[in-house]
C-alpha cells in the first residue's frame, strides 16, 4: 500500500529543460504507479528519498498557496505539469492539489501542458476546457497483460487510457497520444492511429536501453518471454543490431501513419545515449 505524507515545500515553480514550459509544477513527490522504466527513478533528489519508488507519495499541501504568490513574482506565460510525478494519480482524489493548481492557472491566464498516463484527468474536463490547457501528452502502450504486470503493475489499464484519450479528443481538448516506451518485440502499435480517430498525430518513444535499472526491466521481460533473452542482450551490446532494429520500427510506424493519413513523431535514443527532449514544435 502506498504511504501518503503531507509535506510543505519552499517553491512550486521550478525551471525545466523540457521545452513545454518556462517552469514545471509537480504537486507530489513520488508516484504510486511505480513504472519500472520511469526516468524519475534516476533523479538525484528522488534517489536520496528513503523508500522504494512507488511505495510513497509526498503530498505538497502548500503548493496552491505558493503558486498564487509565485505567479505574481515570476509571471510565467506557460508551465508544464507533471515532469517527475503524475498529477492525476490516486492521491489527487483525496487531496485535490492538482485541481486547485489548474483553477489558479486558469484564473491568472497561465497556459500549461500536461504529462500523464491517468484516465482520471477526464474528471477535470471542465477546467481543461477553459482555454489555457495547450496540450496533454497522454502516455499509452499496448502489451500483453503479463508484461504490463511486470513493468508497470499499478498503472491504469491501457484500454482505460485509450478511452480517456478519446473522451478528451471528443471534448476538443488538445491531446497527443504518446506511445511510450516501445518495448522491442512486445509493443503492438498496429492500427494504433485508427484507435484515435479525432487525433491528427501519434508520437512514439523507444525503450531507453541506458536506464540505470535496464537490467531489472529486461529481467521482468525475460520472466514472461524467455525467448527474447538473446535479442535484448544484443540490444545492449551490438550497436549495428540496435540501430537496425529501430530503423525497422520507424519504417513500420511510417507505414501505419501513411495508411491512416496521420502525422507522427518517433523518438529513438542513441545507442547507449538519449534523444533531445524537443516535444514542442
Which stretches of residues belong to each language-model region?
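Glycine-rich phosphate-binding P-loop
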Residues: 35
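Conserved AdoMet/S-adenosylmethionine-binding subsite of the radical SAM
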Residues: 62-252
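N-terminal [4Fe-4S]-dependent radical SAM core
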Residues: 1-31, 40-74, 78
Amino acid at each position: 500500500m502506498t504511504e501518503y505524507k503531507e509535506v510543505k515545500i519552499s517553491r512550486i515553480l521550478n525551471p525545466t529543460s523540457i521545452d513545454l514550459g518556462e517552469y514545471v509544477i509537480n504537486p507530489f513527490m513520488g508516484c504510486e504507479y511505480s513504472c519500472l522504466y520511469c526516468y524519475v527513478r534516476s533523479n538525484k533528489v528522488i534517489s536520496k528519498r528513503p523508500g522504494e519508488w512507488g511505495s510513497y507519495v509526498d503530498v505538497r499541501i502548500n503548493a496552491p498557496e505558493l503558486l498564487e504568490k509565485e505567479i505574481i513574482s515570476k509571471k510565467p506565460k506557460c508551465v508544464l505539469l507533471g515532469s517527475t510525478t503524475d498529477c492525476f494519480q490516486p492521491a489527487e482524489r483525496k487531496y485535490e492539489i492538482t485541481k486547485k493548481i489548474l483553477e489558479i492557472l486558469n484564473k491568472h491566464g497561465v497556459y500549461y501542458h500536461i504529462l500523464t498516463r491517468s484516465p482520471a484527468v477526464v474528471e477535470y474536463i471542465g477546467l481543461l476546457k477553459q482555454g489555457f490547457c495547450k496540450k496533454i501528452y497522454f502516455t499509452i502502450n499496448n502489451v500483453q497483460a503479463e508484461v504490463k504486470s511486470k513493468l508497470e503493475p499499478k498503472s491504469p489499464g491501457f484500454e482505460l487510457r485509450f478511452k480517456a484519450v478519446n473522451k478528451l479528443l471528443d471534448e476538443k481538448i488538445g491531446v497527443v497520444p504518446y506511445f511510450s516506451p516501445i518495448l522491442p518485440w512486445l509493443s503492438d502499435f498496429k492500427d494504433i492511429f485508427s484507435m484515435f480517430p479525432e487525433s491528427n498525430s501519434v508520437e512514439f518513444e523507444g525503450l531507453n536501453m541506458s536506464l540505470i535499472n535496464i537490467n531489472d526491466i529486461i529481467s521482468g521481460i525475460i520472466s514472461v518471454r524467455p525467448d527474447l533473452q538473446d535479442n535484448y542482450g544484443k540490444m545492449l551490446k551490438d550497436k549495428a543490431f540496435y540501430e537496425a532494429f529501430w530503423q525497422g520500427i520507424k519504417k513500420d510506424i511510417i507505414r501505419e501513419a501513411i495508411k491512416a493519413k496521420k502525422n507522427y513523431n518517433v523518438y529513438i535514443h542513441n545507442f547507449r545515449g538519449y534523444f533531445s527532449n524537443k516535444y514542442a514544435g
